[in-house]
Amino acid sequence: MKITALEGQKISELSMIEVAHALLEQNGKEMQFSEIIRAIQDYLEKSDDEIKASISSFYTEINTDGSFIPLGNNVWALRSWYAIDEIDEEVIALDEIEDEEEEKPAKKRKKVNAFGIEDEIDPEDEEGTKETTEEDMSYDTQAEDEDKDDVAAYDAELAEVELDNVDEEVDIELEDDEDDSDDTDED
């Protein structure tokens, strides 16, 4: 197989993308990806193993290279064969479809109770909206009264306890906490 655009160049120095571009240009029509690979393999005289090793990188290059365009069904062509207007029209058509979809009113989402209990009231949902009632206050007042009763009972027990050797004086030495806090800082 001869590719006239590549005559005079060393075959070993050519990339698969260059050969694919020249091949499509010479044929003047779109080609299946598998046909392009076979033609490149024949032209570059590569073995099946070499082609298999480089086919994934070639496919990536042909997709990212701006000079090729996929036509669907694994058929490829040169982008220069197609007028820019044709490509833009396809994009505009897609934009119009998206615009039509946006014009439809969006459905309102309904809140769904994941637990399936419709009548259960969650007190956290109503936090801050509920006024304090006498029942709420009575619990707090009752707890305070119980605390006062406990303190009074404790004081009464202390008064009943007889202290041994009350006459002896006990010396209690108080230490400065400031000195201790300086000693504990190791920074």
From Swiss-Prot:
Biased composition (Acidic residues): 117-149, 157-187
HTH HARE-type domain sequence ranges: 14-81
Keywords, in A-Z order: DNA-directed RNA polymerase, Nucleotidyltransferase, Transcription, Transferase
Transmembrane segments: none
Any one annotated GO CC term: DNA-directed RNA polymerase complex
Highest taxon, organism lineage: Bacteria
Region spans: Disordered: 96-187
Molecular function GO labels: DNA-directed RNA polymerase activity
BP term (GO), one: DNA-templated transcription
HAMAP family: RNApol_bact_RpoE (MF_00357)
Subunit-structure text: RNAP is composed of a core of 2 alpha, a beta and a beta' subunits. The core is associated with a delta subunit and one of several sigma factors.
Protein task: Participates in both the initiation and recycling phases of transcription. In the presence of the delta subunit, RNAP displays an increased specificity of transcription, a decreased affinity for nucleic acids, and an increased efficiency of RNA synthesis because of enhanced recycling.
Family membership noted in the UniProt record: Belongs to the RpoE family.
Entry protein name: Probable DNA-directed RNA polymerase subunit delta
Naturally occurring in which organism (per UniProt): Lactococcus lactis subsp. cremoris (strain SK11)
Taxon lineage: Bacteria, Bacillati, Bacillota, Bacilli, Lactobacillales
